[in-house]
């Protein structure tokens, strides 16, 4: 069974949707799902949610929660990123407010325009740290190969 690491699992709604999608497949329903986040409180919430989702799907996954990125990514078959560096407030709100202040319409703050640039500048350094860890502890993961190939 695969080991799937959810990076930023404290984004509970996003994690719930991803986990539910994964557990809906019999091939993935007994895998190991590692929930990783830097925020212990949000991680505990995500862990409770993961057990509820597994029960709802009548799935029997192994659920692990950790704040240690090396432990989370070690031997991972897949790593799914859902981090939001800086959080919703103040960062995402600012991503919309600054363009608006200068008369620019910000459509989708996480990928386009001025807000997308702000988010990229916050996120890329953190993602490079995870890519370095992945290169060491799960080099055969497709996520690892694609994240480090371009460097």
Task: Please describe what each predicted stretch is.
Residues 1-93, 102, 108-112, 116-151:
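Metallocofactor- and cofactor-centric catalytic cores in central/energy metabolism, strongly enriched
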């Amino acid at each position: 069974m695969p080991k799937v690491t959810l990076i930023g699992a404290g984004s509970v709604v996003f994690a719930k949707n991803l986990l539910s999608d994964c557990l809906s497949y019999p091939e993935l329903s007994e895998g190991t799902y590692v929930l990783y986040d830097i925020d212990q409180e949000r991680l505990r919430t995500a862990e409770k949610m993961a057990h509820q989702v597994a029960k709802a799907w009548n799935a029997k996954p192994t659920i692990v929660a950790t704040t240690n990125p090396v432990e989370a990514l070690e031997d991972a078959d897949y790593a799914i990123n859902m981090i939001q560096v800086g959080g919703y407030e103040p960062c995402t709100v600012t991503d919309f407010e600054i363009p608006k202040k200068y008369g620019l319409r910000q459509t989708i703050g996480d990928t386009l325009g001025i807000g997308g640039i702000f988010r990229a500048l916050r996120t890329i350094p953190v993602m490079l740290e995870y890519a370095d860890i992945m290169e060491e502890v799960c080099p055969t993961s497709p996520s690892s190969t694609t994240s480090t190939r371009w460097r």
